[in-house]
């Protein structure tokens, strides 16, 4: 039964982002707010349901200090709303996705803030094939604010799905004859409960680095897109003479890679390796590439016979687009890798690691040699520049207009400004109060010139913080 509350419930509107819900625990997110969001999500699911049977919903959480309490509030609210809850407990986000497929459950709530700082938390809401984003997220917000709820006698049962997940990956990914030595850095995040175990199941020798679950993240933040978080992994790979180093983010859906020489393999380079394995099986396949990627990736996809096209960044957006066009694989610079080839299409860093190890296990060549023929452009890392949430999209819209007066611009997601010898990007993050900035040039001089163009454009906006390009600027890719 659907009930319209008479009062308006105060739910912070800023927690509803483009493709998930995030906020500071204790300020934006409390158990009470979690309950309201969960009740609104149950009402959303009821509207989508074909009949009045109990709504099955999988609920999981990451290892953040506040996650277990928010998890309990979500489960309680869903049961009160007539949902048949399957509580999978402490899991990575990909294991949560797997649980929905494995158990045949449409609905899902994952309590996680991914790579945000420790004081944050949030929710990923799932229905059908993918996770909610855009207008669907906003519909849940409106339901929460207006107090629309459903009532019923729900239920809850627990399920340990990690053993089934381990079996699934072991059966799907068979390594070749080469014995691999791998350093695994979980950053004390949730991947600690599954990544080392899965890789050992595959027959890999694992050297563990920060693979104890600890929500304070005492050694470094579990965000492998930031080079400073990979420094211990780089050192350990060199000391251990490992074949590869693998880093995972806080909820296990993003991967960072370090080659045998201790060099960071950026997300677009990693995608080149995967496309070289995948595209020969799908001649002429469409290939989604995000606006942050290197021109080297675009050129390599074309060389392999694929059809690249630029699209927006964001895991929910990507998964929906993949389903729409029947894409077999794509990825993001941030380390999200989406395999529909031989897998389910969702982003799973541990599965991506297994696929990389399969490639390495079938060759005697080191990872550094496999990428030696990729054009060596000069690029910055992804740089996050502070900008208030309520201004970041307006700033980007203004920049798009300004850049178009002088340059060719790809504006599908921010402004990818095209120069004859490189490109520069400014886009608004959908999950943090920052602008994401990146640049690439065919020479160090071209890169520096493009960086200066971006710096000068951003400096016109007083609400935008300074651009700190970091130590990696000018490093050859």
Predicted regions located by residue number:
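N-terminal small/polar loop signature for handling phosphorylated ligands or for N-terminal nucleophile
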Residues: 47, 56-120, 197-258
